[in-house]
Amino acid sequence: MLKMTDVSKVYPGGSVALQNVDIHIEPGEFVFVVGPSGAGKSTFIKMLFREVLPTTGSIFVNGVDILSLTPNEIPYMRRQLGIIFQDYRLLPDRTVYENVAFAMEVIETPRRKIKRRVLNVLDLVGLRHRANAYP
């Protein structure tokens, strides 16, 4: 489970990246973060895995306040998240299907569930016909 409550990020100089964001994502849900350039997408994602800290608010992953984690605990928390980045950090030796399935394989999701979810996501974004292609 991922929960952000009243999260804001203001960069030095006063540039507001996010303001009063509230979101609750249940385990197994797929979420797509889309929007125009400068909307705060990258800041939002970077906060989820604690590369950037919010100015205000709280962020919980599976009931753990990630803002209180020590530097040694952060990598373990990150393993609980599956994120595909805007800059296309895809695995070049894996197919589109395998790239989408990768995070679920790491957390040992059953194969049938992975197949169903991956195909649903590929259908949703119109890429099922490219499932066996390489990036």
Predicted regions and their residues:
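ABC ATPase NBD coupling module
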Residues: 66-82, 111
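Short coil-to-helix segment of the ABC ATPase nucleotide-binding domain corresponding to the Q-loop/switch region
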Residues: 94-102
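A short, flexible loop at the N-terminus of ABC-type nucleotide-binding domains that lies
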Residues: 1-4, 10-20, 70
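ABC nucleotide-binding domain "signature motif"
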Residues: 55-65
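Conserved ABC ATPase "signature" region
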Residues: 64-65, 101, 105-108, 112-130
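Interfacial catalytic loop of ABC nucleotide-binding domains
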Residues: 69-72, 116, 132-134
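Helix-to-loop junction immediately C-terminal to a conserved catalytic motif
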Residues: 49
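The feature captures the beta-strand-to-loop junction immediately N-terminal to the Walker
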Residues: 34-36
